């Protein structure tokens, strides 16, 4: 949020056009930035190994960039009963955080899931310069809205990266199948037709658009990606073109 004395040349006019609120552009390469990264470790992120692998890659790349610029990062692994938090500072910790993320193992077979966004909303932490949310966003909009609202109170810049697997975007299932609720471990027998897939995609699109609208409401950044694009394309094309990094 703009404060008296800030450089008016750094006002983000794109955000102002959407929200009529004046925010100052923040970049990861400004000095002494404090970065919070909220990594969704709930069961839905682990169903497809591709999605969990890509989420860790994104968390590692963001952490490495911040630490290489001699900044602070706090990586919060949420959506689990026993939360983990890695706090690092400066380039000396850049390799260590990559090792920590690589070693994250979350085998929770048979364990009921808990809400990632509920934990984000309940967390009371010191204000940071920038916060990143890495999540599939597959939770109720009310929980997502409440978490984002609480983050907005701290008047920091928040970037939401919604990561979905291709199978979630374009399901390949047809006919009689057994579906498993990844959070509650309940099975349901269904007959999947093309019209059902189309209805699912319409509802998913609506859900994702609502998340984007919530981000716009508070002047937060939002982007959606999948596991298919190369990591460098997501990182240096999507994020850079959005002005999140430079």
Q: What positions do the PLM features span?
A:
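An amphipathic, basic-hydrophobic helix/alpha-beta surface used to engage anionic
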Residues: 1-88, 132-134, 150, 219
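A generic local structural motif
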Residues: 22-24, 117-120, 145-146
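A short, compositionally biased
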Residues: 72-73, 98, 172-175
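Short amphipathic beta-strand/extended segments with alternating polar/hydrophobic composition
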Residues: 85-91, 188-192
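Short, electropositive alpha-helical surface patch
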Residues: 88-100, 217-218, 240
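Von Willebrand factor
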Residues: 93-129, 141-142, 164-165
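Von Willebrand factor type A / integrin I
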Residues: 121-129, 141, 146-246
């Amino acid at each position: 949020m703009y404060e008296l004395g800030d450089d008016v040349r750094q006002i983000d006019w794109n955000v102002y056009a959407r929200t009529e609120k004046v925010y100052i552009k923040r970049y990861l390469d400004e000095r002494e930035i404090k970065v919070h990264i909220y990594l969704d470790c709930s069961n839905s992120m682990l169903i497809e190994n591709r999605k969990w692998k890509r989420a860790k890659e994104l968390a590692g790349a963001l952490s490495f960039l911040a630490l290489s610029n001699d900044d602070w990062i706090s990586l919060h692994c949420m959506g689990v009963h026993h939360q983990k938090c890695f706090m690092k500072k400066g380039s000396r910790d850049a390799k260590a955080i990559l090792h920590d993320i690589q070693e994250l193992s979350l085998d929770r077979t048979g364990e009921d899931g808990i809400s990632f966004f509920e934990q984000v909303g309940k967390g009371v932490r010191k204000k940071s310069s920038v916060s990143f949310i890495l999540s599939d966003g597959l939770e109720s909009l009310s929980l997502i809205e409440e978490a984002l609202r609480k983050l907005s109170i701290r008047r920091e810049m928040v970037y939401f990266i919604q990561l979905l697997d291709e199978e979630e975007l374009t399901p390949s299932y047809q006919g009689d199948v057994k579906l498993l609720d990844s959070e509650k471990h309940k099975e349901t027998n269904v007959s999947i037709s093309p019209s059902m897939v189309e209805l699912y995609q319409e509802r998913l699109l609506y859900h994702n658009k609502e998340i984007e609208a919530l981000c716009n409401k508070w002047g937060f950044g939002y982007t959606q990606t999948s596991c298919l694009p190369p990591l460098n394309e997501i990182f240096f094309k999507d994020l850079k073109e959005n002005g999140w990094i430079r």
